[in-house]
């Protein structure tokens, strides 16, 4: 559990939303911005999800590792691929686009100034210019909010990953009387 004093009224929310509930005005703006990467589809949602999860792995961010985006799941991303993610360098089941983006994402997290021209060119070749801009912006979100979760000790999702990832809107069932 986070060390922050979380409002009791948020007990039914996932850990990330509970922490962000301390500043609801920021949460709405952030969620709207972060969701654009998944809805605009300038980058394949499977590639985005693999990179989001790899960033979280590298930073040791428990919450981001415990959730999955519905877009990536709908696009066919399976848990077996996610389980292989920490060893992607040594595996042949990651395609050229995924490999270029994962290489770039790792370097972004570890030392952004160390991204080589060749690594950037591989991403531009795979995603195009607009896709590359969207990808780098998404990496900034993934990196920043993975670090946010680490700093505030946001725990993993209680349901083992069935929740949506940060940026996806909550689908709440209609309540009786409303």
Predicted ranges, named:
Residues 94, 119, 156-159, 163-175:
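Alpha-helical transmembrane segments and membrane-interface helix-loop junctions
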Residues 14-22, 88-93, 103-108:
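A ubiquitous short alpha-helical element
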Residues 34, 50-55, 85-89, 101-109, ...:
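Short alpha-helical scaffolding segments that buttress acidic/His motifs in well-ordered protein cores
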Residues 77-94:
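Carboxylate-rich helix-loop segments that flank metal/cofactor sites and access channels
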Residues 52-82:
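Conserved alpha-helical segments that form or flank metal/cofactor-binding pockets of metalloenzymes
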Residues 113-121:
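Charged, amphipathic alpha-helical coiled-coil/dimerization segments
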Residues 1-49, 69-73, 166-178:
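Mobile cap/lid helix-loop segments that border enzyme active or cofactor-binding sites
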Residues 128-129:
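Transmembrane-helix boundary/entry motifs in multi-pass membrane transporters
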């Amino acid at each position: 559990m986070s060390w922050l004093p979380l409002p009791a009224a948020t007990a039914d929310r996932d850990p990330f939303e509970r922490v962000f509930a301390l500043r609801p005005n920021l949460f709405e703006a952030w969620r709207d911005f972060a969701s654009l990467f998944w809805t605009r589809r300038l980058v394949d949602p499977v590639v985005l999800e693999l990179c989001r999860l790899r960033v979280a792995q590298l930073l040791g961010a428990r919450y981001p590792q415990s959730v999955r985006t519905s877009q990536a799941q709908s696009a066919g991303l399976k848990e077996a691929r996610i389980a292989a993610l920490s060893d992607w360098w040594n595996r042949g089941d990651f395609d050229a686009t995924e490999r270029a983006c994962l290489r770039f994402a790792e370097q972004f997290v570890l030392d952004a100034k160390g991204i080589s021209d060749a690594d950037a060119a591989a991403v531009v070749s795979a995603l195009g210019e607009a896709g590359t801009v969207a990808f780098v912006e998404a990496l900034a979100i993934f990196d920043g909010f993975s670090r946010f979760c680490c700093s505030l000790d946001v725990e993993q999702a209680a349901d083992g990953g069935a929740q949506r990832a940060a940026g996806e809107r909550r689908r709440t069932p209609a309540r009786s009387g409303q």
